[in-house]
Amino acid sequence: MTFSTENNKQIVLGEELGPLSDNERLKKQSNLLRGTIAEDLQDRITGGFTADNFQLIRFHGMYQQDDRDIRNERTKQKLEPLHNVMLRARMPGGIITPTQWLAIDKFATEHSLYGSIRLTTRQTFQFHGVLKPNIKLMHQTLNNIGIDSIATAGDVNRNVLCTTNPVESELHQEAYEWAKKISEHLLPKTRAYAEIWLDGEKVESTEEDEPILGKTYLPRKFKTTVVIPPQNDVDVHANDLNFVAIADNGKLVGFNVLVGGGLAMTHGDTSTYPRRADDFGFIPLEKTLDVAAAVVTTQRDWGNRSNRKNAKTKYTLDRVGTDVFKAEVEKRAGIQFEASRPYEFTERGDRIGWVEGIDGKFHLALFIENGRLLDYPGKPLKTGVAEIAKIHKGDFRMTANQNLIVAGVPKSEKAKIEKIAREHGLMDDNVSEQRKNSMACVAFPTCPLAMAEAERFLPQFVTDVEGILEKHGLPENDNIILRVTGCPNGCGRAMLAEIGLVGKAPGRYNLHLGGNRAGTRVPKMYKENITDKQILEEIDLLVARWSKEREEGEAFGDFTIRAGIIQEVFVSKRDFYA
């Protein structure tokens, strides 16, 4: 056997990794993710969950949070934090119907503290601020419209992303179907979710099995995508497992498989780093699910269960060797990877506005700043989407860039939908290309991990950057892919941006430079722990040089490397901190 977790210590390929982390105890004792969540729900003395259940609810798609803006005030009043949960829905490929949309809109309005729907970088939506008495209702509301939140958090395969590309409608549909199949294939098989939230019939856990994930699930979170080149809107290098669609005459014939991407790191710990995924090669369509399971089970058995900071697939590849990991996947899947088929990523932003698909239907991509759908003064965005949902006969597609596409609109309905969108501030011709190419995670006040502002910080920061670009005479198309993430876990995918800000402390960030527009290069830290004012001063100096010294059409990230401002990261383990 190549691995063992006996006697509370982990050995992989003859190497002892150390004692198992406490999360491994928690999963083992959880009775296949049940824990005592059902009992906790009945406890109305506290709005939160006990320590173990606090972790276990993640496997059910929720995080316990509180409002950090009022935490100190509640402490002064001798009150516990305002505990609530954030739920992330499971929506492979991000497709949702108008009927489903109206139901989630109603729930967010009536049963959440913030009244918003948050589109996320995981191509789904989140409810924020749901109090304990409403949690069961939330799951049952979703179930009634065919949605769940199983495995959108925790040590499992998370929501499967798929390129939002309705123009190539036939190819997109095939890719989307594979995203759904992969999601279903890798889902936990436990009945815990149905039992606890949907009042399903209880079963003895001895009758259940987890053939792919195992009874202690994965060492850490696991992220999967299906991507259609030349678009890289899902950011393949942020994910553990990627299926790159290879088409022949518009028909899907197979996938190139990329393994071991990931962006999370820990401040001050050089054993952690963002990493690009490795290309394992091409597979035919019929081997897709076998390969998905083989990658997941290899990571299940070989991933680090002693140190969670080094537990992701990217570290497993660097520890055991990419070739060794790949050979094990081939053995388990009963396949030999073929040479990768050629493809190229050239863009990853959403095409905001109307585009016509090859089927003659039209698709309207709406720019939603930071993905937050709420009714703002003079911009009732959330109401606007609901009004569109009332008349729209196609579907909606959430994007990994936190935007929303109204898809499948007949030509005869275009004017009607555009009128609603414009009346509610969902279409604005004055939004700059720079703003469209900027993104932030949620951070304060709801994310417990946030070290600095992100979503609330970004709008004004982008305005300031727009001013710098204008000052140096740069035209509208010369924008910079700019991302802000409130902590080094990287939900805002700043570690694949041309300018990436990573929260370090309130009002302070690490400034990273050197990513590229296609999302195939990891940026490197340029300045550490500096204020937003200092960041803008640095950007001003850099943009001044870019405007004067760049080559024809040279993007900002490429310029910073060619000019020697920052060193290129080729191999993250070696170069990221060098």
From Swiss-Prot:
Keyword annotations from UniProtKB, A to Z: 4Fe-4S, Amino-acid biosynthesis, Cysteine biosynthesis, Heme, Iron, Iron-sulfur, Metal-binding, NADP, Oxidoreductase
InterPro entries: CysI, NiRdtase/SiRdtase_haem-b_fer, Nit/Sulf_reduc_fer-like_dom_sf, NO2/SO3_Rdtase_4Fe4S_dom, NO2/SO3_Rdtase_4Fe4S_prot, NO2/SO3_Rdtase_4Fe4S_sf, NO2/SO3_Rdtase_FeS/sirohaem_BS
GO BP terms in the entry: cysteine biosynthetic process; hydrogen sulfide biosynthetic process; sulfate assimilation
Cofactor: siroheme; [4Fe-4S] cluster
PROSITE patterns hit by this protein: NIR_SIR (PS00365)
Enzyme class: oxidoreductase
UniProt pathway annotation: Sulfur metabolism; hydrogen sulfide biosynthesis; hydrogen sulfide from sulfite (NADPH route): step 1/1
Function (record text): Component of the sulfite reductase complex that catalyzes the 6-electron reduction of sulfite to sulfide. This is one of several activities required for the biosynthesis of L-cysteine from sulfate.
HAMAP family listed in its UniProt record: CysI (MF_01540)
PANTHER family (UniProt xref): SULFITE REDUCTASE [NADPH] SUBUNIT BETA, SULFITE REDUCTASE [NADPH] SUBUNIT BETA-RELATED
Name under which the protein is recorded: Sulfite reductase [NADPH] hemoprotein beta-component
UniProt lineage: Bacteria, Pseudomonadati, Pseudomonadota, Gammaproteobacteria, Vibrionales
Gene giving rise to this polypeptide: cysI
